[in-house]
């Protein structure tokens, strides 16, 4: 996993990974206590987080690195996946299989993979049926609810694009 790779590379560079927190841990007061009362040089954030959390971390750490898909409008080092290129590769494959009516299940707002989905379908001259776009949180529950929404509408689609594994 990405977290394991970061841990290995840190070790190679003579750094020690002292703590690992999930998004659930960040809301816990004990986590804030650990952050504020222990000397730690830096933090690596994997995946989405809001600017207030980044600002908080920047206050307590000399180095903050964000790793994710959507770029942040912030002055932090960022390691980004080219989500447009990834989406293009996936949709090119789906299109090569003959699919022309492709539904979407996932987040829409500030989501580069959704923007790529729209643009790639338009560039291929395909009509986008707005009813076949299910704006749901990208999670297993979101994917489940999005699939139910599509099935209840009895739409004519032959493929579904989900931006991540959990949603799929």
Functional labels for PLM-detected ranges:
Residues 22-26, 45-51, 108, 166:
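Short beta->alpha connector loops
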């Amino acid at each position: 996993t990405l977290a394991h790779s970061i841990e290995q590379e840190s070790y190679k560079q003579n750094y020690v990974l002292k703590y690992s927190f999930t998004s659930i841990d960040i809301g816990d007061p004990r986590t804030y206590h650990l952050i504020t009362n222990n000397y730690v040089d830096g933090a690596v954030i994997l995946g989405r987080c809001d600017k207030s959390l980044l600002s908080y971390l920047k206050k307590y750490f000399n180095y903050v690195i964000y790793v994710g898909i959507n770029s942040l409008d912030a002055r932090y080092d960022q390691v980004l996946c080219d989500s447009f290129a990834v989406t293009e590769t996936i949709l090119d494959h789906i299109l090569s299989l003959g699919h022309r009516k492709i539904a979407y299940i996932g987040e829409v707002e500030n989501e580069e993979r959704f923007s790529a989905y729209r643009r790639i379908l338009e560039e291929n001259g395909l009509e986008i049926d707005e009813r076949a776009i299910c704006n749901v949180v990208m999670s297993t529950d979101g994917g489940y609810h999005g699939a139910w929404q599509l099935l209840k509408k009895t739409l004519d689609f032959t493929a579904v694009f989900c931006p991540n594994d959990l949603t799929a």
